[in-house]
Amino acid sequence: MSKYLVVGLGNPGLEYEKTKHNVGFMCIDELLKEHTLFLNNSKFNGQFVKVDQPEDQIFIAKPMTYMNNSGEFVYEICKFYKIHEQNILVIYDDIDTDVGKIRVKAKGSSGGQNGIKSIISKMNTEKIKRIRIGIGKPVHNLTHHVLTKFSAEDSIKVQQAIIKAKDACNEFLNHVDFDKIMNKFNV
């Protein structure tokens, strides 16, 4: 039986809800809603749902560690359930991608994003599949930028990007070749 983990990054708490840093959480919410699933497990300082299918076991999750320590949750759930690194897909915000765009990658460095940096460090590999959802470059302060909400205009673009990211997650979970997923969504 193959095991897969789709994890969206963000910060827990109402004060961070709908902020730019939480687009990974928002994507997970869309994925859960589409499949009528709920995060019904709390373990490893995170929340997740485990879905048993005939040939696969799927985990959809949100770390509750705060962004910068996301690797702790990912490492612990993967170790406990024996999820291989090639079966992990991480969704997170990216300041180097325009608002409303997504970038799908099979591996690479963190690009300075602390959540994926933590995961790369704890898992000891850059071979982590990921979907970066664009939040645009900050005008001034980076921390202020990622912890603020989107403008009304940008909210529409971001919601469309979240839907695309959710669709890419579904293709990953349906065993579509990852190169095909990248070619389809990196337009």
UniProtKB/Swiss-Prot annotation:
<keyword id="KW-0820">tRNA-binding</keyword>
<keyword id="KW-0963">Cytoplasm</keyword>
<dbReference type="GO" id="GO:0004045">
    <property type="term" value="F:peptidyl-tRNA hydrolase activity"/>
</dbReference>
<feature type="active site" description="Proton acceptor">
    <location>
        <position position="21"/>
    </location>
</feature>
<comment type="function">
    <text>Hydrolyzes ribosome-free peptidyl-tRNAs (with 1 or more amino acids incorporated), which drop off the ribosome during protein synthesis, or as a result of ribosome stalling.</text>
</comment>
<keyword id="KW-0378">Hydrolase</keyword>
<feature type="binding site">
    <location>
        <position position="68"/>
    </location>
    <ligand>
        <name>tRNA</name>
    </ligand>
</feature>
<dbReference type="Pfam" id="PF01195">
    <property type="entry name" value="Pept_tRNA_hydro"/>
</dbReference>
<feature type="binding site">
    <location>
        <position position="16"/>
    </location>
    <ligand>
        <name>tRNA</name>
    </ligand>
</feature>
<dbReference type="InterPro" id="IPR001328">
    <property type="entry name" value="Pept_tRNA_hydro"/>
</dbReference>
<comment type="function">
    <text>Catalyzes the release of premature peptidyl moieties from peptidyl-tRNA molecules trapped in stalled 50S ribosomal subunits, and thus maintains levels of free tRNAs and 50S ribosomes.</text>
</comment>
<keyword id="KW-0694">RNA-binding</keyword>
<feature type="site" description="Discriminates between blocked and unblocked aminoacyl-tRNA">
    <location>
        <position position="11"/>
    </location>
</feature>
<dbReference type="GO" id="GO:0072344">
    <property type="term" value="P:rescue of stalled ribosome"/>
</dbReference>
<dbReference type="GO" id="GO:0000049">
    <property type="term" value="F:tRNA binding"/>
</dbReference>
<dbReference type="InterPro" id="IPR036416">
    <property type="entry name" value="Pept_tRNA_hydro_sf"/>
</dbReference>
<comment type="similarity">
    <text>Belongs to the PTH family.</text>
</comment>
<dbReference type="GO" id="GO:0005737">
    <property type="term" value="C:cytoplasm"/>
</dbReference>
<feature type="binding site">
    <location>
        <position position="114"/>
    </location>
    <ligand>
        <name>tRNA</name>
    </ligand>
</feature>
<dbReference type="GO" id="GO:0006515">
    <property type="term" value="P:protein quality control for misfolded or incompletely synthesized proteins"/>
</dbReference>
<dbReference type="InterPro" id="IPR018171">
    <property type="entry name" value="Pept_tRNA_hydro_CS"/>
</dbReference>
<feature type="site" description="Stabilizes the basic form of H active site to accept a proton">
    <location>
        <position position="93"/>
    </location>
</feature>
<feature type="binding site">
    <location>
        <position position="66"/>
    </location>
    <ligand>
        <name>tRNA</name>
    </ligand>
</feature>
<comment type="subunit">
    <text>Monomer.</text>
</comment>
<protein>
    <recommendedName>
        <fullName>Peptidyl-tRNA hydrolase</fullName>
        <ecNumber>3.1.1.29</ecNumber>
    </recommendedName>
</protein>
